[in-house]
């Protein structure tokens, strides 16, 4: 099953949405917040990405990496239905919040107990 929401997750999302807007240099012209069994998702629609998708992804990765709390984020930049990846920019893959290996590798191998991952995420959210 899906994980349950974590207390204060909305506050964390709102903080990083604001930080993204500030670093991008403009506010989104439309936003939405989706909450379901899988968790919480903030969607922001910004103008001007078509011409500067690499900069948008670099802003996103910087937020994901700039603080321990940012490690819980997964910011996707999608333009015309195409997701811009870290590898598209020659950036390293996201690291695991528990051991530092690549997150995809740990997920694929199920290297960590769900309870350990959830506890780490909870701790990071509580620091926001």
Task: Label the model's feature ranges.
Residues 8-16, 55, 113, 117:
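Short amphipathic alpha-helical segments
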Residues 32-85, 123:
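A broadly conserved sequence feature marking short terminus-proximal activation segments
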Residues 16-24, 63-67, 125:
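Hydrophobic, Leu/Ile/Phe/Ala-enriched alpha-helical segments that form helix-helix packing faces
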Residues 68-128:
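Cys/His-clustered metal-coordination modules, chiefly Zn-binding fingers
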Residues 1-3, 48-52, 102-105:
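A generic structural motif
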Residues 1-28:
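General detector of N-terminal leader/presequence modules that precede the first folded domain
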């Amino acid at each position: 099953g899906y994980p349950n929401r974590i207390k204060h997750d909305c506050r964390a999302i709102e903080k990083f949405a604001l930080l993204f807007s500030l670093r991008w240099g403009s506010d989104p012209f439309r936003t939405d917040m989706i909450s379901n069994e899988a968790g919480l998702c903030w969607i922001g629609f910004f103008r001007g990405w078509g011409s500067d998708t690499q900069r948008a992804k670099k802003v996103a990765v910087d937020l994901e990496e700039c603080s321990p709390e940012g490690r819980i984020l997964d910011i996707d930049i999608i333009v015309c239905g195409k997701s811009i990846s870290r590898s598209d920019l020659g950036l390293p893959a996201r690291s695991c919040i528990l051991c530092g290996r690549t997150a995809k590798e740990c997920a694929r191998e199920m290297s960590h107990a769900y309870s350990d991952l959830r506890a780490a995420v909870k701790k990071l959210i509580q620091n926001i």
